[in-house]
UniProtKB/Swiss-Prot annotation:
HAMAP family: IPP_trans (MF_00185). Keywords: ATP-binding, Magnesium, Nucleotide-binding, Transferase, tRNA processing. It comes from the Bacteria. InterPro entries: Dimethylallyltransferase (IPR039657), IPT (IPR018022), P-loop_NTPase (IPR027417). Signal peptide: none annotated. One of its GO terms (molecular function) is ATP binding. This is tRNA dimethylallyltransferase. Belongs to the IPP transferase family. The gene is miaA. It catalyses: adenosine(37) in tRNA + dimethylallyl diphosphate = N(6)-dimethylallyladenosine(37) in tRNA + diphosphate. Residues 35-38 are annotated as: Interaction with substrate tRNA. The record marks 101, 124 as: Interaction with substrate tRNA.
Length: 326
């Protein structure tokens, strides 16, 4: 049985959450978070999680599901996401995938499989010490030697993925690219919606976004985690905003330096997100600066229905179509 689902993706700060909640007025959806950081409990401000009030407007899945000291793998994401998708459809609702983690989408839609190799925390600690001492490019050069195929697809500063690839090679003696063979799946009727905005406007919004997070208490959020023993050893603390403020709390950076670094790295990450997403050929892109939220939701609704029907799924809620077209 093929399941109809929709995807709202795009770089950080483009309004994916707002659109998903507006779309829920027209389409009976449950939202599945496709965000590698929102899975962690106690990390709310820096990950821009939907508020508890927002989560009452539509059911949400894969948010706050593991503690911050837990190593949440891509393979586990796929398993949990597929389970949520099946259960949502069984309840008579439509799965709406929302988030900006490209690797999660690639795995979920079967573009490649992920090896089930448990984490080696000691190995990771050694790798991070090397990166701190000799620079991130040292590890990237090592990855190029043992797994050039993966290295060609990973940004030289994407330390988390570089260390994971080296870890897999260290534990099983094979490149992760060799284990993660290509594997296409055709389980879904899919409509992919992408959000973007002009770069200058986007960067301005990103800077304001960081300032608002600081005002909301991001420093205290990081401090509380640090006092509980959650530091740079854990994957959760590698998220942008957390690792920079951790350096401030440890006296390695001033507050101004750490905030400037958060803004800089957020912009760099957004550039990489645009690069990743632009590789997909089947995304309907919308410039969010050109529409009100209500206008955009109606356009996206009709795009989703048209996509499903062009793939052979007949959407039955004619009342909903009329309401959107009014």
């Amino acid at each position: 049985m093929k399941i109809p689902l929709a995807v709202i993706l795009g770089p950080t700060g483009t309004g994916k959450t707002d659109l998903s909640l507006e779309l829920a007025k027209y389409l009976p959806v449950e939202i599945v978070s496709v965000d590698s950081m929102q899975v962690y409990q106690g990390m709310d401000i820096g990950t821009a999680k939907p508020s508890l009030e927002d989560r009452k407007r539509a059911p949400h899945h894969l948010i706050d599901i593991v503690p911050p000291d837990y190593f949440f793998t891509v393979a586990e994401f796929k398993e949990r996401a597929l389970k949520a998708i099946d259960e949502i459809y069984e309840r008579g609702h439509y799965p709406l995938l929302v988030g900006g983690t490209p690797l999660y989408y690639k795995v979920l839609f079967g573009e490649f499989s992920i090896p089930h190799v448990p984490p080696d925390l000691e190995f990771r600690k050694k790798m991070r010490e090397i990166a701190e001492r000799e620079g991130e490019y040292k590890l990237y050069e090592e990855l190029k030697k043992v797994d050039p195929k993966t290295a060609s697809k990973v940004h030289p500063r994407d330390l988390k993925r570089i260390i994971r690839a080296l870890e897999v090679y260290h534990k099983v003696g094979k490149p992760i690219s060799e284990i993660a063979g290509e594997k296409k799946e055709d389980r879904f009727f899919v409509s992919k919606i992408g959000l973007y905005m002009p770069r200058e406007l986007h960067y301005k919004i990103l800077e304001q976004r960081v300032d608002k997070m600081i005002e909301k208490g991001l420093i205290d959020e990081v401090r509380n985690l640090y006092l509980k023993g959650i530091d740079e050893r854990f994957v959760s603390m590698q998220g942008i905003g957390y690792k920079e403020l951790l350096k401030y709390l440890k006296g390695e950076l001033t507050l101004e330096e750490s905030i400037d670094l958060i803004k800089k790295r957020t912009k760099e990450f957004v550039k990489r997100q645009y690069t990743w997403f632009k590789k997909y050929k089947d995304i309907h892109w919308f410039d969010v600066s050109q529409y009100s939220l209500s206008q955009l939701a109606k356009l996206v609704y009709n795009t989703i229905i048209n996509d499903w029907e062009s793939q052979g799924y007949r959407y039955q809620d004619q009342e909903g179509v009329d309401k959107v077209n009014d």
